[in-house]
Amino acid sequence: MGRVKPKFIKSLAEKLLEAYPDRFTESFKENKKAVAELADIPSKTVRNKVAGYITRLVKRQKAKEKAEQAA
């Protein structure tokens, strides 16, 4: 089982995704670079957790859109 992400990571990721939806993809590496450019996060660990959570959110959105199109 995975670990639950802290609230500040989730809220920051959601704010970034809402403000810049076209900057993020399903690629963690690209999202990591985008988070580094868009947010002032001094910690590498926190930056990676935010990028990882954004990657999960983007994948969920795409899967949801695909399921809606198939239905």
From Swiss-Prot:
Q: Which residues form the signal peptide?
A: none
Here the disulfide bonds are: none
UniProt keywords (A-Z) are:
Ribonucleoprotein, Ribosomal protein
Name of protein: Small ribosomal subunit protein eS17
Quote any Pfam family the record assigns.
Ribosomal_S17e
The similarity comment for this entry is: Belongs to the eukaryotic ribosomal protein eS17 family.
Lineage: superkingdom: Archaea
Encoding gene (name): rps17e
- Print the organism lineage: Archaea, Thermoproteota, Thermoprotei, Thermoproteales, Thermoproteaceae
GO MF:
structural constituent of ribosome
> What PANTHER family does its record include?
40S RIBOSOMAL PROTEIN S17 (PTHR10732:SF0)
The Gene Ontology biological process annotation of the record reads: translation
Q: Name one GO cellular component term.
A: ribonucleoprotein complex
Instruction: List the InterPro entries hit by this protein, alphabetically.
Output: Ribosomal_eS17, Ribosomal_eS17_CS, Ribosomal_eS17_sf
Is Ribosomal protein given among the entry's keywords?
yes
